[in-house]
């Protein structure tokens, strides 16, 4: 894509490395901060936290175990941000890795179009008893719900936490299960 055809994104995207940054800036007109992979420094976390107080922060990390660890670490420090998830199977045909730099352009555009707003508050939007009544201990139901919400698959307890981070109520979750 040439400079004129890049898609404008408001906010700042957080990704893992320089090759991810280069790929994202080929496609999008956006500011990017890199975590330098698992070498995530306290200074970088503080920078991202400060930026999140003034503008939109979008976490677009690799869909591998390392990306999940980095996302989890950042989530501990942020209160308002967006999560983007890319399907690991959306990588380029000859790619050996499954990082953002190796993803199909269409998958990255879709991930940003389906970004999920996260706002942490002290109150739970769905209670554990309500969650249990939805029978989400069934893996098929969790997969259905995650697909309908454009989220990656989460285990039982992780999904409960994510639903609260998304501020989804019992009624919201019920609608997405139909």
UniProtKB/Swiss-Prot annotation:
What SUPFAM superfamilies would the database entry show? Toprim domain
**Any idea which positions bind Mg(2+) 2?**
62, 64
GO molecular function terms attached to this record: metal ion binding; ribonuclease M5 activity; rRNA binding
Q: List the disulfide bonds.
A: none
What GO terms fall under cellular component here? cytoplasm
EC numbers for this chain:
3.1.26.8
Q: Which Pfam families match?
A: DUF4093, Toprim
* Keyword annotations from UniProtKB, A to Z: Cytoplasm, Endonuclease, Hydrolase, Magnesium, Metal-binding, Nuclease, Ribosome biogenesis, RNA-binding, rRNA processing, rRNA-binding
Cofactor(s) essential for the protein: Mg(2+)
Primary location class: cytoplasm
Q: Which reaction does it catalyse?
A: Endonucleolytic cleavage of RNA, removing 21 and 42 nucleotides, respectively, from the 5'- and 3'-termini of a 5S-rRNA precursor
The enzyme's first-digit EC class, named in words, is: hydrolase
What CDD domains does UniProt report for this protein, alphabetically?
TOPRIM_RNase_M5_like (cd01027)
The note describing how and how many cofactors are bound reads:
Binds two Mg(2+) per subunit.
Q: Which InterPro entries match?
A: RNase_M5, RNase_M5_C, TOPRIM_dom, TOPRIM_RNase_M5-like
The record lists the membrane-crossing segments as none
Localization, per the record, is: Cytoplasm
Record flagged with keyword Secreted: no
rRNA processing keyword on record = yes
Q: Which SMART domains match?
A: TOPRIM
Function (record text): Required for correct processing of both the 5' and 3' ends of 5S rRNA precursor. Cleaves both sides of a double-stranded region yielding mature 5S rRNA in one step.
Family, per the entry?
Belongs to the ribonuclease M5 family.
Q: What is this protein called?
A: Ribonuclease M5
Q: Which organism is it from?
A: Mycoplasma genitalium (strain ATCC 33530 / DSM 19775 / NCTC 10195 / G37) (Mycoplasmoides genitalium)
| Gene that encodes the chain | rnmV
